[in-house]
């Protein structure tokens, strides 16, 4: 099966890629909302994100992360469409250095290199839920925040 035979796969992948690009470069909900349902939910088994329940909150959390880590960048390692389950999975690595103000402690100069995965669930052409799989404890230790 090819993307030409299944245009919905291409559309889902394109939407997910465009969402990922604006979300993980810190553009916030204003840039992300066009790819998501207004009430899109969010979940993660990570203490740092315990109070984040909507995709709007998460997009703005990512925007806020780039204040203390202004050089933060993501390297996508894998992007996969699961047509049967109506979702797209992205595996990436986030790298950056805590040089900016606004973190839980003054700038540490320490670097983060964090693996993480998004599973973006679709309803129709837009994202309805995002699950983030991430070991926040290691990331917080790397930055000197824990």
Residue spans for each PLM region:
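C-terminal and inter-domain tail/linker signature
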Residues: 2-146
């Amino acid at each position: 099966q090819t993307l030409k035979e299944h245009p919905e796969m291409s559309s889902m992948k394109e939407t997910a890629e465009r969402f990922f690009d604006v979300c993980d470069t810190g553009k916030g909900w204003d840039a992300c909302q066009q790819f998501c349902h207004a009430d899109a939910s969010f979940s993660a088994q990570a203490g740092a994100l315990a109070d984040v329940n909507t995709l709007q909150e998460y997009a703005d959390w990512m925007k806020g992360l780039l204040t203390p880590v202004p050089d933060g960048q993501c390297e996508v390692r894998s992007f996969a469409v699961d047509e049967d389950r109506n979702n797209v999975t992205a595996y990436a690595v986030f790298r950056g250095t805590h040089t900016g103000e606004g973190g839980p402690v003054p700038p540490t100069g320490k670097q983060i290199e964090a693996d993480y995965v998004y599973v973006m669930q679709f309803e129709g052409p837009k994202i309805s839920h995002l699950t983030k799989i991430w070991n926040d404890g290691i990331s917080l230790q790397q930055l000197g925040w824990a």
